[in-house]
Amino acid sequence: MACKVLVVDLDGTLTLGRNTYELSAEALLALRRARDAGIRVVLATANGLDFALTVARYLGIRDVIAENGCLVHLDGVTYELCSGDMAEVDRLVLSTGVVKPSHQNKCRKYDLAYIPLREDAVERLRDVLGPGYVVESSGYAIHVRPAGVDKGTAVKWLCQRLGVPCFQVASVGDSDVDVGMLSVSWGFAVGNATPAAKKAAKVVVDGPSGIGFKEAVEIILSGGACAP
């Protein structure tokens, strides 16, 4: 089996669908199968680190990529992959009136989350903030963070840290915020993923969300992924 590391998104990938937070039983069983096979599983999420670590504990996962790649928790140590003070950015974002803040923001450091109040909220924030910041939607929230960091940069950092080639890392995701990690690894997009996620992935499975994740794990365990 060529796959050494499996990086998996949370919302929309381990859940029953892209519009629910309820975890998929099929996905949980597939996670266990991957761990039992000796694959190192990493949770990669847009959520804040504290929340991500709590969820990861119940999933039997130790390592976490949080805030869309801004923070990595590896072997009990947290690493910051970007820098800067987001307080002024937050004030500017809220002054537009096109979003409201997520309750998680008080626990977030670099990637701030917002609930859209208008359909054009992403475009409006991109115009206001300019090229120094990334503004994108996960399907659950709008995220704003410094440019130059995403789940893909975090996966590449992880590969260097662990001494594992990126082609021996599989990833599974469903949304635009997963494009980076799907591009730099052996990426799987679930069947109901966004067009951008499907385009970035090497493999698009048939099943949606948690069922699709199960299908991806089956392919990985059968040796059908992570070839150079």
Curated annotation (Swiss-Prot):
Which keywords label this protein?
Carbohydrate metabolism, Hydrolase, Magnesium, Metal-binding
Lineage, top-rank taxon, reads Archaea
Q: Please tell me one Gene Ontology term that the record gives under cellular component.
A: cytosol
What GO molecular function annotation could you give as one example from this UniProt entry? phosphoglycolate phosphatase activity
A Pfam family recorded for this sequence: Hydrolase_3
Q: Keyword tRNA-binding on this protein?
A: no
| Catalytic-site annotation from UniProt | D9
Indicate the secretion signal residues. none
Q: Which cofactor does it need?
A: Mg(2+)
Q: What is its EC number?
A: 3.1.3.18
Keyword Hydrolase applies: yes
Q: Which residues bind substrate?
A: K151
Q: Binding positions for Mg(2+)?
A: D9, D11, D174, D178
Q: Which reaction does it catalyse?
A: 2-phosphoglycolate + H2O = glycolate + phosphate
What protein family does this chain belong to?
A: Belongs to the archaeal SPP-like hydrolase family.
Describe the task this protein carries out. Catalyzes the dephosphorylation of 2-phosphoglycolate.
Under PANTHER family, the record lists: HAD SUPERFAMILY HYDROLASE-LIKE, TYPE 3 (PTHR10000:SF8), PHOSPHOSERINE PHOSPHATASE (PTHR10000)
* Name of the protein this chain belongs to: Phosphoglycolate phosphatase
The scientific name of the source species is Pyrobaculum aerophilum (strain ATCC 51768 / DSM 7523 / JCM 9630 / CIP 104966 / NBRC 100827 / IM2)
